[in-house]
């Protein structure tokens, strides 16, 4: 084992020791009992559900709900950054959710107004049709 490997091993041991010390501390128990931990943890259900929906038919995607979730997560990312102390778990949860919901939004737009709908109608025609008949859940052919 050379000198750099010994140094990196000592650094890893030091980080591990500090982490274990923190796990045993009253501060960690206080964190586990706070909404700073449980709120974001329970919030991770939303992006997990969105990931599971990535393989489903794009007809099932609600454009309004996807847009609302993108906006909601963007607002709460800002909140998680500005609150004191900063809530990095909440920030990560909402950054993850914004990313996944944006992917769902892209699938929605591509299906209803873009690539998949381009062969039948122009994007403009699809948008105008959706504006005239927002309650119709299927594309007119």
From Swiss-Prot:
Gene name in the database record: mpc1
Subcellular location, record wording: Mitochondrion; Mitochondrion inner membrane
Bilayer topology term: Multi-pass membrane protein
Regions crossing the membrane: 31-52, 60-82
Protein name, per record: Probable mitochondrial pyruvate carrier 1
Organism of this sequence: Schizosaccharomyces pombe (strain 972 / ATCC 24843) (Fission yeast)
Xref: InterPro entries: MPC
GO molecular function, one term: pyruvate transmembrane transporter activity
Protein family: Belongs to the mitochondrial pyruvate carrier (MPC) (TC 2.A.105) family.
